[in-house]
Amino acid sequence: MARKVVVVDDEKPIADILEFNLKKEGYDVYCAYDGNDAVDLIYEEEPDIVLLDIMLPGRDGMEVCREVRKKYEMPIIMLTAKDSEIDKVLGLELGADDYVTKPFSTRELIARVKANLRRHYSQPAQEVSGATNEITIKDIVIYPDAYSIKKRGEDIELTHREFELFHYLSKHMGQVMTREHLLQTVWGYDYFGDVRTVDVTIRRLREKIEDDPSHPEYIVTRRGVGYFLQQHD
């Protein structure tokens, strides 16, 4: 069965180009041209991935992303004409998985679509190299097979990408990982984003798992190098 893609862009020529090229790749494509219709379309079609413009009439892309994340975990790639770190970072903090700045290469965007779909929907047994055992880190228990984490017995709601990042760090406890390395291994080798994506995802993780995110005891920064998961006896 073909993967479903929802394209949301108020510039119809751009949406048409994306629809044409994505259909050539074998995807089922549905388009919306404003924020309100986008939410309705996503709820109706329940796509496998969403390409979401930031600047939209009605609800903007940020509002749409926030609304969709209340119910769904499919990858969301933000499309922005504003070459602004604020927009990019805010989009990721709301739960977007990736972003592309206009003008963009259709070939690059399709590569990102494939990378996000592959990473999000690949089988857990493959992604964790057959690991089935629980991983305990102080008060946190990771359940690889269930793609879930608990802290002091309480479930921690993580996105797919957040889980992958935390689980990867847990398999390399105490080892400092550069942002570039994490982009390659967690986001995929053909990921075209910048290292700021890692920083934002780390910040989201800390807000969910740390007692005091400003003084983390699990995910530690090695300034100028990267991140590592602190060992606990």
Swiss-Prot record:
Residues annotated as transmembrane: none
GO CC terms: cytosol; protein-DNA complex
The entry's DNA-binding region: 132-231
PROSITE patterns from the UniProt entry: OMPR_PHOB, RESPONSE_REGULATORY
PTM section of the record: Phosphorylated by WalK.
Domain of life of the source: Bacteria
GO biological process: regulation of DNA-templated transcription
UniProt-annotated location(s): Cytoplasm
Keywords: Activator, Cytoplasm, DNA-binding, Phosphoprotein, Transcription, Transcription regulation, Two-component regulatory system
Span of domain Response regulatory: 4-117
Residue numbers carrying 4-aspartylphosphate: 53
GO molecular-function term, one example from the UniProt record: transcription cis-regulatory region binding
Protein's job: Member of the two-component regulatory system WalK/WalR.
UniProt protein name: Transcriptional regulatory protein WalR
Natural source organism: Staphylococcus epidermidis (strain ATCC 35984 / DSM 28319 / BCRC 17069 / CCUG 31568 / BM 3577 / RP62A)
Origin organism lineage: Bacteria, Bacillati, Bacillota, Bacilli, Bacillales
